[in-house]
């Protein structure tokens, strides 16, 4: 039990660092807004020049209080730790180390930023915490429904994309943001569920092959190939 809990905290801290790298090294320098708290903080940072980490902390205060009430003290504690780690890592990289953008090419920045953030969020979820913002709302919804976490986040991120388009006065940057968010949601699923797999099933039958093929297609939507053997 102790070993598992230590591993959970390692997931949370490492995920927080990856998320911070995605924001500071790829997205924020290129005015590309990711989703959730990080994306909203990037937008607000360009409206009022407070450090992104501070904005993230301010946005998450009411949501953390909600998590205490509805999601339990342990989850809330881990979420507070995660939010603090992200805020510290973001401002450490941006304000103290002065980390420069790894790429000014929008395609590379969007994809690698999305990969860093998606992997980071996946690790944070795997550790039993939330990065705050949309992820807390997603946790509330997914705990009561069968909707996937990534789907909820994708919907909520749309609001951030619209806000980014208005603030940055660029539809193109909003479109890049959508690509980054899509990449991050796919990485969340890969970390939590694993990479998608495909299987081949061989069915041997002496008769009724066409009927069997039709039944498989009608029930599963999967086509097949009939091979005659001797």
Predicted segments with their positions:
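Peripheral (non-transmembrane) domains and long loops of multi-pass membrane proteins
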Residues: 195-230
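Core subunits and conserved enzymes of cellular information-processing
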Residues: 1-209
């Amino acid at each position: 039990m102790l070993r598992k809990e230590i591993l959970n905290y390692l997931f949370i801290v490492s995920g927080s660092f990856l998320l911070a790298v995605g924001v500071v090294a790829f997205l924020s320098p290129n005015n590309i807004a990711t989703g959730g708290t990080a994306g909203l903080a990037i937008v607000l940072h360009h409206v009022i020049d407070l450090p992104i980490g501070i904005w993230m902390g301010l946005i998450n205060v009411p949501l953390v209080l909600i998590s205490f009430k509805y999601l339990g003290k342990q989850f809330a504690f881990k979420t507070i730790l995660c939010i603090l780690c992200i805020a510290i890592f973001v401002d450490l990289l941006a304000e103290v180390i002065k980390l420069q953008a790894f790429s000014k090419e929008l395609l590379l920045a969007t994809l690698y930023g999305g990969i860093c953030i998606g992997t980071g969020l996946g690790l944070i979820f795997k550790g039993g915490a939330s990065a705050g913002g949309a992820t807390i709302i997603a946790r509330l919804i997914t705990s009561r429904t069968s909707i996937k976490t990534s789907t909820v986040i994708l919907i909520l991120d749309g609001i951030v994309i619209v806000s980014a388009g208005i603030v940055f006065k660029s539809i193109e940057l909003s479109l890049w943001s959508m690509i980054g968010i899509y990449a991050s949601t796919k990485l969340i699923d890969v970390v939590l569920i694993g990479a998608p797999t495909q299987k081949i099933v061989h069915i041997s039958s002496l008769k009724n092959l066409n009927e069997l093929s039709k039944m498989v297609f009608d029930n599963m939507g999967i086509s097949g190939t009939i091979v005659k053997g001797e």
